[in-house]
A protein has these predicted regions:
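Catalytic cores of carbohydrate-active enzymes across secretory and cytosolic contexts
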Residues: 1-529
Protein backbone atom coordinates (compact mmCIF):
# COMPACT_ATOMS: atom_id res chain seq x y z
CA UNK A 1 0.00 0.00 0.00
CA UNK A 2 1.33 3.49 -0.81
CA UNK A 3 1.95 5.75 2.19
CA UNK A 4 -0.64 8.31 3.28
CA UNK A 5 0.74 11.77 2.52
CA UNK A 6 -0.09 15.14 4.09
CA UNK A 7 0.82 17.84 1.56
CA UNK A 8 1.45 21.21 3.28
CA UNK A 9 1.40 24.41 1.25
CA UNK A 10 0.67 28.07 2.00
CA UNK A 11 -1.53 28.40 -1.11
CA UNK A 12 -3.68 26.17 -3.32
CA UNK A 13 -4.97 27.10 -6.77
CA UNK A 14 -8.07 25.00 -7.45
CA UNK A 15 -10.30 27.50 -9.27
CA UNK A 16 -10.56 31.25 -9.84
CA UNK A 17 -13.70 31.32 -7.67
CA UNK A 18 -11.55 30.29 -4.70
CA UNK A 19 -8.68 32.83 -4.82
CA UNK A 20 -6.40 31.46 -2.10
CA UNK A 21 -3.37 31.40 -4.42
CA UNK A 22 -0.84 33.98 -5.58
CA UNK A 23 0.96 32.25 -8.41
CA UNK A 24 2.78 29.16 -9.60
CA UNK A 25 3.33 27.60 -6.17
CA UNK A 26 -0.39 27.52 -5.48
CA UNK A 27 -1.35 26.34 -8.96
CA UNK A 28 1.18 23.51 -8.62
CA UNK A 29 -0.32 22.52 -5.26
CA UNK A 30 -3.84 22.57 -6.70
CA UNK A 31 -2.81 20.46 -9.68
CA UNK A 32 -1.02 18.04 -7.35
CA UNK A 33 -4.08 17.29 -5.21
CA UNK A 34 -6.30 17.07 -8.30
CA UNK A 35 -4.05 14.41 -9.82
CA UNK A 36 -3.80 12.62 -6.47
CA UNK A 37 -7.60 12.39 -6.51
CA UNK A 38 -7.68 11.19 -10.14
CA UNK A 39 -5.06 8.51 -9.40
CA UNK A 40 -6.74 7.52 -6.11
CA UNK A 41 -3.53 8.22 -4.22
CA UNK A 42 -3.86 8.67 -0.42
CA UNK A 43 -3.12 12.40 -0.13
CA UNK A 44 -4.62 15.13 2.05
CA UNK A 45 -3.75 18.78 1.46
CA UNK A 46 -3.11 21.13 4.40
CA UNK A 47 -3.31 24.91 4.05
CA UNK A 48 -4.95 28.09 5.35
CA UNK A 49 -8.32 29.61 4.52
CA UNK A 50 -7.50 33.16 3.46
CA UNK A 51 -10.35 35.54 4.26
CA UNK A 52 -9.77 37.86 1.32
CA UNK A 53 -7.60 35.75 -0.91
CA UNK A 54 -5.03 37.30 -3.19
CA UNK A 55 -5.38 40.72 -4.79
CA UNK A 56 -7.78 41.86 -7.49
CA UNK A 57 -5.71 44.00 -9.84
CA UNK A 58 -7.10 47.29 -11.13
CA UNK A 59 -5.41 49.86 -13.36
CA UNK A 60 -5.47 53.54 -12.45
CA UNK A 61 -5.81 56.37 -15.01
CA UNK A 62 -2.02 56.52 -15.44
CA UNK A 63 -1.77 52.76 -15.89
CA UNK A 64 -0.38 52.11 -12.42
CA UNK A 65 -1.89 48.96 -10.86
CA UNK A 66 -3.76 49.07 -7.58
CA UNK A 67 -4.88 46.15 -5.44
CA UNK A 68 -8.23 45.30 -3.90
CA UNK A 69 -8.87 42.46 -1.47
CA UNK A 70 -12.57 41.61 -1.67
CA UNK A 71 -14.15 38.79 0.26
CA UNK A 72 -15.47 35.88 -1.78
CA UNK A 73 -18.39 33.47 -1.30
CA UNK A 74 -17.27 30.20 0.27
CA UNK A 75 -20.38 28.09 0.67
CA UNK A 76 -18.37 25.09 -0.53
CA UNK A 77 -16.38 24.93 2.73
CA UNK A 78 -17.38 21.99 4.94
CA UNK A 79 -16.78 22.37 8.68
CA UNK A 80 -15.06 19.23 10.00
CA UNK A 81 -16.10 20.17 13.54
CA UNK A 82 -12.46 19.95 14.61
CA UNK A 83 -10.84 22.82 16.50
CA UNK A 84 -7.14 23.16 17.28
CA UNK A 85 -5.17 25.62 19.38
CA UNK A 86 -1.77 27.14 18.67
CA UNK A 87 0.20 29.78 20.54
CA UNK A 88 0.92 33.00 18.67
CA UNK A 89 2.94 35.40 20.83
CA UNK A 90 1.12 35.59 24.18
CA UNK A 91 -2.21 34.40 22.81
CA UNK A 92 -3.81 30.99 22.38
CA UNK A 93 -5.40 31.02 18.94
CA UNK A 94 -8.25 28.60 18.31
CA UNK A 95 -8.66 27.57 14.68
CA UNK A 96 -11.49 25.89 12.82
CA UNK A 97 -10.62 23.16 10.31
CA UNK A 98 -12.49 23.35 7.01
CA UNK A 99 -12.56 20.65 4.33
CA UNK A 100 -12.79 21.31 0.57
CA UNK A 101 -13.35 18.70 -2.17
CA UNK A 102 -15.39 20.68 -4.70
CA UNK A 103 -13.03 20.72 -7.70
CA UNK A 104 -12.20 17.05 -8.14
CA UNK A 105 -9.34 17.28 -5.66
CA UNK A 106 -8.05 15.11 -2.85
CA UNK A 107 -9.35 16.35 0.53
CA UNK A 108 -7.97 19.78 1.38
CA UNK A 109 -7.94 20.88 5.03
CA UNK A 110 -7.86 24.64 5.62
CA UNK A 111 -7.31 26.27 9.00
CA UNK A 112 -8.91 29.58 9.98
CA UNK A 113 -8.95 31.37 13.36
CA UNK A 114 -12.33 31.25 15.11
CA UNK A 115 -12.19 34.56 17.00
CA UNK A 116 -12.60 37.76 15.02
CA UNK A 117 -9.66 39.22 16.95
CA UNK A 118 -7.38 36.52 15.55
CA UNK A 119 -8.52 36.78 11.93
CA UNK A 120 -5.66 39.16 11.13
CA UNK A 121 -3.52 36.05 10.77
CA UNK A 122 -5.38 34.80 7.69
CA UNK A 123 -6.66 38.15 6.42
CA UNK A 124 -4.34 38.19 3.41
CA UNK A 125 -1.94 35.77 1.76
CA UNK A 126 1.74 36.63 2.30
CA UNK A 127 1.39 39.56 4.66
CA UNK A 128 4.62 41.59 4.58
CA UNK A 129 5.15 42.07 8.33
CA UNK A 130 7.26 39.58 10.26
CA UNK A 131 4.63 39.03 12.97
CA UNK A 132 1.90 38.23 10.44
CA UNK A 133 4.10 36.01 8.27
CA UNK A 134 5.39 33.94 11.20
CA UNK A 135 1.88 33.70 12.69
CA UNK A 136 0.66 32.33 9.35
CA UNK A 137 3.47 29.79 9.29
CA UNK A 138 2.76 28.71 12.86
CA UNK A 139 -0.90 28.17 12.04
CA UNK A 140 -0.03 26.23 8.88
CA UNK A 141 2.71 24.06 10.37
CA UNK A 142 1.88 23.57 14.04
CA UNK A 143 -1.87 23.88 13.54
CA UNK A 144 -1.74 21.58 10.52
CA UNK A 145 -0.08 18.76 12.46
CA UNK A 146 -2.54 19.15 15.35
CA UNK A 147 -5.49 19.10 12.92
CA UNK A 148 -4.28 15.86 11.34
CA UNK A 149 -3.86 14.29 14.79
CA UNK A 150 -7.32 15.38 15.93
CA UNK A 151 -8.91 14.03 12.76
CA UNK A 152 -7.28 10.67 13.48
CA UNK A 153 -5.49 10.54 10.13
CA UNK A 154 -2.63 8.05 10.03
CA UNK A 155 -0.14 10.11 8.05
CA UNK A 156 3.11 8.40 7.11
CA UNK A 157 4.70 11.15 4.98
CA UNK A 158 4.61 14.89 5.70
CA UNK A 159 5.43 16.80 2.50
CA UNK A 160 6.43 20.44 2.96
CA UNK A 161 5.94 22.26 -0.37
CA UNK A 162 8.35 25.15 0.27
CA UNK A 163 9.71 26.32 3.60
CA UNK A 164 6.54 27.92 4.98
CA UNK A 165 5.53 24.63 6.65
CA UNK A 166 8.73 23.78 8.52
CA UNK A 167 7.26 24.59 11.95
CA UNK A 168 5.28 21.38 11.44
CA UNK A 169 8.59 19.56 11.79
CA UNK A 170 9.42 21.53 14.93
CA UNK A 171 6.04 20.54 16.39
CA UNK A 172 6.62 16.86 15.52
CA UNK A 173 9.98 16.92 17.34
CA UNK A 174 8.35 18.63 20.34
CA UNK A 175 5.66 15.89 20.43
CA UNK A 176 8.30 13.20 20.86
CA UNK A 177 10.36 15.19 23.33
CA UNK A 178 7.22 15.58 25.47
CA UNK A 179 7.18 11.77 25.65
CA UNK A 180 10.77 11.73 26.95
CA UNK A 181 12.63 11.19 23.68
CA UNK A 182 15.91 13.18 23.54
CA UNK A 183 16.12 15.96 20.95
CA UNK A 184 18.56 14.27 18.56
CA UNK A 185 16.66 10.99 18.60
CA UNK A 186 13.34 12.81 18.15
CA UNK A 187 14.79 14.70 15.19
CA UNK A 188 16.02 11.47 13.59
CA UNK A 189 12.59 9.87 14.03
CA UNK A 190 10.74 12.85 12.59
CA UNK A 191 13.14 13.11 9.68
CA UNK A 192 12.05 9.67 8.48
CA UNK A 193 8.55 11.06 7.93
CA UNK A 194 9.31 14.38 6.20
CA UNK A 195 10.09 15.25 2.58
CA UNK A 196 10.66 18.77 1.29
CA UNK A 197 10.31 20.61 -2.02
CA UNK A 198 12.40 23.71 -2.66
CA UNK A 199 11.45 26.18 -5.39
CA UNK A 200 13.61 29.28 -5.01
CA UNK A 201 16.87 29.26 -7.04
CA UNK A 202 18.50 32.28 -5.38
CA UNK A 203 19.64 32.45 -1.72
CA UNK A 204 18.09 35.90 -1.18
CA UNK A 205 14.64 34.55 -2.02
CA UNK A 206 14.67 32.07 0.85
CA UNK A 207 12.95 33.19 4.03
CA UNK A 208 15.06 33.98 7.12
CA UNK A 209 13.78 35.04 10.57
CA UNK A 210 15.59 36.24 13.72
CA UNK A 211 15.51 33.39 16.22
CA UNK A 212 14.53 35.71 19.09
CA UNK A 213 11.45 36.79 17.13
CA UNK A 214 10.47 33.17 16.48
CA UNK A 215 10.66 32.52 20.22
CA UNK A 216 8.60 35.62 21.01
CA UNK A 217 5.95 34.57 18.51
CA UNK A 218 5.75 30.95 19.66
CA UNK A 219 7.27 29.15 16.67
CA UNK A 220 9.81 27.19 18.71
CA UNK A 221 7.28 24.78 20.29
CA UNK A 222 9.31 24.48 23.53
CA UNK A 223 12.59 23.75 21.72
CA UNK A 224 15.46 25.76 23.22
CA UNK A 225 17.70 28.09 21.24
CA UNK A 226 20.51 25.66 20.48
CA UNK A 227 18.01 23.08 19.25
CA UNK A 228 16.37 25.56 16.89
CA UNK A 229 19.83 26.63 15.72
CA UNK A 230 20.67 23.00 14.92
CA UNK A 231 17.64 22.90 12.62
CA UNK A 232 17.75 26.23 10.82
CA UNK A 233 20.73 28.23 12.01
CA UNK A 234 20.66 31.66 13.61
CA UNK A 235 19.04 33.62 12.05
CA UNK A 236 16.66 30.78 11.25
CA UNK A 237 16.61 29.89 7.54
CA UNK A 238 13.35 28.18 6.58
CA UNK A 239 14.87 26.38 3.56
CA UNK A 240 17.87 25.15 5.55
CA UNK A 241 15.43 23.85 8.19
CA UNK A 242 13.42 22.09 5.48
CA UNK A 243 16.55 20.40 4.17
CA UNK A 244 17.68 19.32 7.65
CA UNK A 245 14.25 18.14 8.77
CA UNK A 246 13.65 15.94 5.70
CA UNK A 247 15.00 12.54 4.70
CA UNK A 248 14.77 13.52 1.05
CA UNK A 249 14.21 16.76 -0.85
CA UNK A 250 13.52 17.72 -4.42
CA UNK A 251 13.90 20.55 -6.88
CA UNK A 252 11.29 21.12 -9.58
CA UNK A 253 13.22 20.65 -12.84
CA UNK A 254 16.49 19.03 -13.87
CA UNK A 255 18.27 22.38 -14.21
CA UNK A 256 16.81 23.61 -10.93
CA UNK A 257 18.16 20.45 -9.31
CA UNK A 258 21.68 21.34 -10.45
CA UNK A 259 21.27 24.91 -9.20
CA UNK A 260 19.82 23.82 -5.84
CA UNK A 261 22.48 21.21 -5.14
CA UNK A 262 25.19 23.78 -5.81
CA UNK A 263 23.43 26.45 -3.75
CA UNK A 264 22.94 24.28 -0.64
CA UNK A 265 25.98 21.98 -0.86
CA UNK A 266 27.65 23.55 2.19
CA UNK A 267 24.65 23.02 4.50
CA UNK A 268 25.72 20.39 7.00
CA UNK A 269 23.11 17.68 7.52
CA UNK A 270 21.01 18.64 4.50
CA UNK A 271 19.04 15.93 2.75
CA UNK A 272 19.83 14.84 -0.79
CA UNK A 273 18.11 17.00 -3.43
CA UNK A 274 16.74 15.07 -6.40
CA UNK A 275 14.98 16.61 -9.40
CA UNK A 276 11.29 15.91 -10.01
CA UNK A 277 10.06 18.18 -12.77
CA UNK A 278 6.68 19.80 -12.21
CA UNK A 279 3.64 18.92 -14.26
CA UNK A 280 0.17 20.33 -14.85
CA UNK A 281 -3.32 18.85 -14.48
CA UNK A 282 -4.37 17.95 -18.00
CA UNK A 283 -8.18 18.03 -17.50
CA UNK A 284 -7.89 21.53 -15.96
CA UNK A 285 -5.56 23.08 -18.51
CA UNK A 286 -6.06 21.29 -21.84
CA UNK A 287 -9.20 22.25 -23.73
CA UNK A 288 -11.36 19.19 -24.42
CA UNK A 289 -11.68 20.24 -28.06
CA UNK A 290 -7.91 20.01 -28.48
CA UNK A 291 -7.97 16.47 -27.08
CA UNK A 292 -10.65 15.52 -29.59
CA UNK A 293 -8.81 17.14 -32.51
CA UNK A 294 -5.42 15.47 -31.89
CA UNK A 295 -4.32 13.47 -34.90
CA UNK A 296 -6.28 15.57 -37.41
CA UNK A 297 -4.33 18.40 -39.00
CA UNK A 298 -7.44 20.17 -40.25
CA UNK A 299 -9.31 19.61 -37.00
CA UNK A 300 -6.39 20.81 -34.87
CA UNK A 301 -5.97 24.03 -36.87
CA UNK A 302 -9.69 24.80 -36.89
CA UNK A 303 -9.92 24.13 -33.15
CA UNK A 304 -6.96 26.39 -32.48
CA UNK A 305 -8.50 29.16 -34.56
CA UNK A 306 -11.74 28.86 -32.57
CA UNK A 307 -9.79 29.10 -29.30
CA UNK A 308 -7.87 32.09 -30.64
CA UNK A 309 -11.12 33.87 -31.48
CA UNK A 310 -12.38 33.17 -27.96
CA UNK A 311 -9.19 34.74 -26.57
CA UNK A 312 -9.51 37.83 -28.77
CA UNK A 313 -13.19 38.19 -27.84
CA UNK A 314 -12.27 37.99 -24.14
CA UNK A 315 -9.57 40.62 -24.62
CA UNK A 316 -12.02 42.94 -26.39
CA UNK A 317 -14.59 42.49 -23.63
CA UNK A 318 -12.08 43.18 -20.85
CA UNK A 319 -9.95 45.92 -22.41
CA UNK A 320 -11.71 47.26 -25.53
CA UNK A 321 -8.69 46.32 -27.66
CA UNK A 322 -9.42 44.60 -30.98
CA UNK A 323 -6.67 42.26 -32.17
CA UNK A 324 -6.48 40.65 -35.61
CA UNK A 325 -7.19 36.88 -35.69
CA UNK A 326 -4.93 36.45 -38.74
CA UNK A 327 -1.83 37.93 -37.08
CA UNK A 328 0.69 35.88 -35.07
CA UNK A 329 -0.34 36.36 -31.44
CA UNK A 330 2.29 36.01 -28.73
CA UNK A 331 1.19 35.53 -25.12
CA UNK A 332 3.17 36.38 -21.99
CA UNK A 333 1.41 35.93 -18.65
CA UNK A 334 3.16 35.42 -15.34
CA UNK A 335 3.98 37.10 -12.07
CA UNK A 336 5.52 40.57 -12.45
CA UNK A 337 9.02 39.85 -11.17
CA UNK A 338 12.13 41.56 -12.51
CA UNK A 339 14.01 38.33 -13.37
CA UNK A 340 11.18 37.31 -15.73
CA UNK A 341 11.98 40.36 -17.94
CA UNK A 342 8.45 40.83 -19.23
CA UNK A 343 9.47 43.94 -21.19
CA UNK A 344 12.58 42.47 -22.82
CA UNK A 345 11.04 42.45 -26.31
CA UNK A 346 10.49 46.24 -26.13
CA UNK A 347 14.13 47.08 -25.39
CA UNK A 348 15.05 47.34 -29.09
CA UNK A 349 12.55 50.01 -30.07
CA UNK A 350 13.47 50.08 -33.77
CA UNK A 351 12.92 46.35 -34.25
CA UNK A 352 9.67 46.12 -32.31
CA UNK A 353 8.39 49.23 -34.11
CA UNK A 354 9.07 47.57 -37.45
CA UNK A 355 7.36 44.30 -36.55
CA UNK A 356 4.30 45.96 -35.08
CA UNK A 357 3.95 48.61 -37.78
CA UNK A 358 4.04 45.87 -40.38
CA UNK A 359 1.31 43.98 -38.50
CA UNK A 360 3.55 40.91 -38.39
CA UNK A 361 2.76 40.10 -34.77
CA UNK A 362 0.70 41.23 -31.79
CA UNK A 363 1.45 40.83 -28.08
CA UNK A 364 -0.81 39.98 -25.14
CA UNK A 365 0.47 40.47 -21.58
CA UNK A 366 -1.01 39.70 -18.17
CA UNK A 367 0.35 39.29 -14.66
CA UNK A 368 0.15 40.63 -11.13
CA UNK A 369 2.81 42.23 -9.00
CA UNK A 370 2.98 41.41 -5.32
CA UNK A 371 0.92 44.14 -3.60
CA UNK A 372 3.98 45.32 -1.64
CA UNK A 373 6.49 45.11 -4.51
CA UNK A 374 7.22 48.54 -5.96
CA UNK A 375 9.43 47.11 -8.71
CA UNK A 376 6.67 44.71 -9.77
CA UNK A 377 4.24 47.62 -9.85
CA UNK A 378 6.65 49.50 -12.13
CA UNK A 379 6.90 46.47 -14.44
CA UNK A 380 3.11 46.31 -14.83
CA UNK A 381 2.87 50.07 -15.41
CA UNK A 382 5.51 49.79 -18.14
CA UNK A 383 3.55 47.02 -19.90
CA UNK A 384 0.43 49.19 -19.75
CA UNK A 385 2.45 52.06 -21.24
CA UNK A 386 3.55 49.78 -24.10
CA UNK A 387 -0.09 48.82 -24.73
CA UNK A 388 -1.00 52.51 -24.95
CA UNK A 389 1.94 53.20 -27.25
CA UNK A 390 0.87 50.39 -29.62
CA UNK A 391 -2.95 50.26 -29.48
CA UNK A 392 -4.60 47.17 -30.97
CA UNK A 393 -1.16 45.60 -31.37
CA UNK A 394 -0.08 45.28 -27.73
CA UNK A 395 -2.52 44.72 -24.90
CA UNK A 396 -2.24 44.28 -21.15
CA UNK A 397 -5.14 42.34 -19.63
CA UNK A 398 -5.54 43.14 -15.91
CA UNK A 399 -6.45 40.85 -13.02
CA UNK A 400 -4.68 37.69 -14.16
CA UNK A 401 -6.24 34.61 -12.56
CA UNK A 402 -6.83 30.94 -13.38
CA UNK A 403 -9.74 31.73 -15.68
CA UNK A 404 -7.72 34.18 -17.76
CA UNK A 405 -4.76 31.78 -17.72
CA UNK A 406 -6.89 29.06 -19.31
CA UNK A 407 -8.05 31.38 -22.10
CA UNK A 408 -4.53 32.70 -22.78
CA UNK A 409 -2.75 29.34 -22.79
CA UNK A 410 -5.35 27.96 -25.19
CA UNK A 411 -5.74 30.86 -27.59
CA UNK A 412 -2.28 32.36 -28.18
CA UNK A 413 -0.17 31.13 -31.10
CA UNK A 414 3.16 31.40 -29.26
CA UNK A 415 4.02 31.43 -25.55
CA UNK A 416 6.96 33.72 -24.77
CA UNK A 417 9.24 33.11 -21.79
CA UNK A 418 12.48 35.05 -21.33
CA UNK A 419 13.69 34.89 -17.72
CA UNK A 420 17.28 35.39 -16.67
CA UNK A 421 18.64 31.85 -16.72
CA UNK A 422 18.81 29.94 -14.32
CA UNK A 423 16.32 31.85 -12.14
CA UNK A 424 13.11 30.18 -13.42
CA UNK A 425 12.80 27.05 -11.28
CA UNK A 426 10.30 25.43 -13.65
CA UNK A 427 7.69 27.63 -15.39
CA UNK A 428 4.53 25.56 -15.71
CA UNK A 429 2.57 28.08 -17.80
CA UNK A 430 4.56 26.90 -20.81
CA UNK A 431 3.40 23.33 -20.17
CA UNK A 432 -0.23 24.48 -20.17
CA UNK A 433 0.31 26.28 -23.45
CA UNK A 434 2.02 23.26 -25.01
CA UNK A 435 -0.88 20.98 -24.04
CA UNK A 436 -3.05 23.17 -26.27
CA UNK A 437 -0.68 23.32 -29.22
CA UNK A 438 0.62 26.80 -28.34
CA UNK A 439 4.30 26.79 -29.29
CA UNK A 440 6.89 27.87 -26.73
CA UNK A 441 9.51 30.48 -27.57
CA UNK A 442 11.68 30.38 -24.48
CA UNK A 443 15.06 30.82 -22.90
CA UNK A 444 16.49 27.38 -22.01
CA UNK A 445 15.50 27.64 -18.36
CA UNK A 446 13.25 25.68 -16.02
CA UNK A 447 11.43 22.82 -17.74
CA UNK A 448 12.18 23.90 -21.32
CA UNK A 449 15.67 22.29 -21.68
CA UNK A 450 13.96 18.94 -21.02
CA UNK A 451 11.25 19.49 -23.64
CA UNK A 452 12.65 21.68 -26.41
CA UNK A 453 13.33 20.17 -29.82
CA UNK A 454 14.21 23.43 -31.55
CA UNK A 455 12.21 24.02 -34.69
CA UNK A 456 10.11 20.89 -34.20
CA UNK A 457 8.00 21.51 -31.08
CA UNK A 458 8.95 25.10 -30.27
CA UNK A 459 12.08 27.27 -30.16
CA UNK A 460 14.95 28.04 -27.84
CA UNK A 461 16.07 31.62 -27.27
CA UNK A 462 19.87 31.53 -27.18
CA UNK A 463 22.25 28.70 -26.38
CA UNK A 464 21.58 28.14 -22.69
CA UNK A 465 24.51 30.20 -21.44
CA UNK A 466 24.12 32.02 -18.13
CA UNK A 467 26.23 34.37 -16.08
CA UNK A 468 27.69 35.93 -19.24
CA UNK A 469 28.43 39.64 -19.81
CA UNK A 470 25.43 41.63 -21.03
CA UNK A 471 23.07 38.69 -20.70
CA UNK A 472 20.09 40.94 -21.40
CA UNK A 473 21.63 42.14 -24.65
CA UNK A 474 22.59 38.64 -25.78
CA UNK A 475 19.15 37.26 -25.00
CA UNK A 476 17.41 40.18 -26.70
CA UNK A 477 19.41 39.64 -29.89
CA UNK A 478 18.70 35.89 -29.74
CA UNK A 479 14.99 36.57 -29.19
CA UNK A 480 14.75 38.76 -32.29
CA UNK A 481 16.92 36.44 -34.39
CA UNK A 482 14.70 33.47 -33.55
CA UNK A 483 11.47 35.42 -33.92
CA UNK A 484 12.38 36.89 -37.31
CA UNK A 485 14.35 33.94 -38.66
CA UNK A 486 12.32 30.98 -37.38
CA UNK A 487 8.97 31.79 -35.81
CA UNK A 488 7.49 34.17 -38.39
CA UNK A 489 8.50 32.00 -41.39
CA UNK A 490 7.04 28.92 -39.68
CA UNK A 491 3.75 30.73 -39.06
CA UNK A 492 3.51 31.39 -42.80
CA UNK A 493 3.74 27.63 -43.46
CA UNK A 494 0.51 26.19 -42.05
CA UNK A 495 1.43 22.55 -42.60
CA UNK A 496 4.69 22.94 -40.71
CA UNK A 497 3.00 24.94 -37.96
CA UNK A 498 0.30 22.32 -37.38
CA UNK A 499 2.93 19.56 -37.29
CA UNK A 500 4.78 21.53 -34.61
CA UNK A 501 1.54 22.00 -32.68
CA UNK A 502 0.96 18.24 -32.70
CA UNK A 503 4.54 17.60 -31.58
CA UNK A 504 4.32 19.99 -28.65
CA UNK A 505 0.99 18.53 -27.52
CA UNK A 506 2.49 15.04 -27.66
CA UNK A 507 5.54 15.87 -25.54
CA UNK A 508 3.55 17.88 -22.98
CA UNK A 509 0.92 15.16 -22.54
CA UNK A 510 3.48 12.37 -22.31
CA UNK A 511 6.04 13.96 -19.99
CA UNK A 512 4.69 17.06 -18.25
CA UNK A 513 1.37 16.11 -16.66
CA UNK A 514 0.79 16.31 -12.91
CA UNK A 515 -0.28 12.64 -13.06
CA UNK A 516 3.32 11.78 -14.03
CA UNK A 517 4.58 14.14 -11.34
CA UNK A 518 2.47 12.57 -8.57
CA UNK A 519 3.52 9.06 -9.55
CA UNK A 520 7.15 10.18 -9.53
CA UNK A 521 6.75 11.68 -6.06
CA UNK A 522 5.37 8.40 -4.75
CA UNK A 523 8.14 6.38 -6.41
CA UNK A 524 11.14 8.62 -5.71
CA UNK A 525 10.31 10.84 -2.73
CA UNK A 526 7.72 9.10 -0.59
CA UNK A 527 8.84 5.46 -0.92
CA UNK A 528 11.33 4.17 1.65
CA UNK A 529 14.81 3.18 0.64
Amino acid sequence: MPPTVAYFCMEFGLHEDFPIYAGGLGILAGDFIKSAHDLKRPVVGVGLRWARGYSRQRLGPEGVPTDEFPEYPADFLDDTGVRVRVRVAAREVEARVWRVERWGNAPLLLLEPVAEGDRWITRRLYEPTLDARVAQEILLGVGGVRALRKLGLDVEVFHFNEGHAVFAGVEMIAERMAEGVPFREAWDQVRQQIVFTTHTPIPAGNEVHPQAELRRLGACCELVDWEMEQLGGNPFNMTVAGLRLSRRANAVSALHGEVSRAMWRDVEGASEIVAITNGVHVPTWQDARIREARGSAIGLWETHQALKRELLDAIAARTGAHLDPDVLTIGFARRAASYKRSDLIFRDRARIDGLLAGRRLQLVFAGKNHPDDAEGRRIVANLVAMARRYPDMVVFVPDYDMGLARVLTRGADVWLNNPIRPLEACGTSGMKAALNGVLNLSVLDGWWPEACDHGRNGWAIGDGADGVPDQDGRDLEALYATLEGDVLPAYADRERWVNMMQACIDVAAARFSSDRMVEEYFARLYARG
